[in-house]
Amino acid sequence: MVLLSIQTLPSSYPTLNNYTFNYRSQRQSQSQNQNQNQNQNQRRCVKIRSNVIRCGIAEPSGEPAPLGQKTKYNDGLFEKAFMTLFARKMENFAAKSASKNGSQKEEKKKGWFEYDYDSFVDVSRKVMQGRSRLQQQQVVREVLMSMLPPGAPAQFRKLFPPTKWAAEFNAAITVPFFFWLVGPSEVVEVEIDGVKQKSGVHIKKCRYLENSGCVGMCVNMCKIPTQDFFTNEFGLPLTMNPNFEDMSCEMVYGQVPPPFEEDPVAKQPCLADICTIANPSSSFCPKLQA
């Protein structure tokens, strides 16, 4: 009777197979929805992390803007913290310079994370005013030293003696840790004294040079003091070769920098088209004078 009853049920009546099929369909649908929600949450987390913790280029291509155009960046908390730290240290020297020149004005001090890259560059420009090339470089050295704990240079020398490994290691960590300052870069192979090693860093379009537009700021506030700091304080030679035609730069760890008088940058003229304080009539940037 039971078998007969099952056989005579209308075809539209939900049988056991129908229930099984519907149950499986519902489970698959729920699973797909859960996966979609998880993917959306993951994408949202990645977006939040990229916007808050790490900065990135905001250009559609993901690469620095073409020469003549200013690259757009999305700076996160990590980047703004470094901008604030450096800017506040340099503001002390900018205030001293303004006081000596009798042009000091009352300016409200910005809070943490209120600094952006433009304000960081602006402070650098104020430090440069009223100082010679050597004085500008000395300010940067003092700023860098003030950010290190006591005995840090000596510890660095012990951890990173001037070897191929130390040069390659520092090149590798330069790429992620200095993105906020110079923009995207990559480790490249270089040759030092006939030995090939991956201790070079190619900066695609230096953010500092792009925003300052000043040869003097590039050389006096970045290139020379950074070379000097690594070579003389840390004991790890470093040479930086900026390219003022495309705003790229090459950092070579393990290579001793030449004396300033023998460095090609010593005779570099102003970027008259973009520098606000350029002297087009001079054969080289006036800020490069001692």
Sequence positions of predicted segments:
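Generic structural hydrophobic/aromatic packing signal, biased to beta-strands
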Residues: 177, 201-203, 226, 240, ...
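N-terminal accessory segment detector
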Residues: 2-30, 39-202, 207-217, 258-290
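Short Gly/Ser/Thr- and Asp/Glu-enriched loop/turn motifs at secondary-structure junctions
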Residues: 196, 243-248
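Structured beta-strand/turn binding interfaces of compact recognition modules in eukaryotic regulators
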Residues: 206, 241, 254-256
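Conserved short secondary-structure elements within globular domains
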Residues: 211, 219-241
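C-terminal edge-of-domain segments
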Residues: 247-257
